[in-house]
Amino acid sequence: VSSTQRRVEHGITIDADVETVFDLVADVARWPQFHLSAVHAETVHANEKGELVKYWALDGDAAVRTWQTVRRTDRPGRRITFAHMEARPPATELRGEWVFTELAPDRTRVELSHQVGAPADADLGPLPDGLAQDSEDCLTTLRDTAERHADLDELVVSFTDPLFIAGSVEDAYDYLYRADLWPERIPHVVGLAMTEDEPNVQFFDMDTKGPDGSTHTVRSVRICLPSRLIVYKQISLPAMLDAHTGHWRFTETPEGVVAEARHTSTIKRSALSQLGGATTVGEARRYLRRLLSGNSMSNLRLAKAYAEERAGF
């Protein structure tokens, strides 16, 4: 069967230095904080030929799609190439590249291209338009993030809190995996409606009670990698945040388990008045750290008590 190639190309000019822009694309672990649809990405393995990266992304507001690509990063050549391990039918091949050109010390041109291979008689349907829309969204987000990078250094709050658990990793993981039981297990969670239509992909709407007694509802998506990692991203956000992602990570040790809670939040500068008229970014950072750390450490201590009781301690 004869085949044909179709190329989809998009570009954007960004008022930021080429290294900043390149780094934002190269570091896939940071994508979920800035790209609306990105939920999680991790390197499966890497060698001198490149790295195999697995991605999870929102498909609407109630589903997640996942795919794997082989990426090769050429920093001196300012180029990142990628090839999908499996193309979405009827495509038989999907590959592409990012090319970064320095126009001036603080101005960069970025070109993102995709090449789609398919049988000559195949109807690609919405695939090219979907790639075009995804590319435009991705480039726009890249521009906005790169041009705000100095501001975001101040507005992004990121921290990790660990806790040792003298129990099994399976029990510690299970306690936090079973979010449907949180209203009866975790004091600040007053309601939670969860769906898990695909194993280990959870969507839930959670009602939490704040220190002042007020109730907030957020919608989140979670990717659960059994006994190892639970990654989450808030889809609907509190008024003072532009983004909130994080994870629960579980690491076995000879003595038990180290469980860690990670939060990365982007403060919305225009909403600082939510905390009081003259609130500074520094005060908002301290408030967020205290609130988020308090909640997640409380959850970890409950997971610890559950796992250690089941271990006979």
What is the meaning of each model-derived region?
Residues I80, W98, F159, L163, ...:
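A broad, low-specificity signal marking well-ordered, structured residues that form hydrophobic/aromatic
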Residues Y55-G60, Q115-A120, D144-A150, E154-L163, ...:
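A general structural signal for short secondary-structure boundary/capping elements
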Residues A29-Q33, E42-R95, D137, D180-E184, ...:
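Glycine-rich portal/gate segments that line the openings of hydrophobic small-molecule binding cavities
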Residues Q5-R7, Y55-G60, T66-W67, A83-T140, ...:
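Beta-strand/loop substructures that line and gate deep hydrophobic ligand-binding cavities in soluble
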Residues G11-T13, R72, V99, P162-F164, ...:
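Generic structural detector for well-ordered beta-strands
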Residues S158-T160, T217, T245:
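Transmembrane beta-barrel architecture of outer membranes
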Residues V1-K49, E136-E198, F313:
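Hydrophobic ligand-binding cavity/cleft-lining segments
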Residues A16, R75, E102, V116-A118, ...:
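Non-catalytic surface loops within mature trypsin-like serine protease
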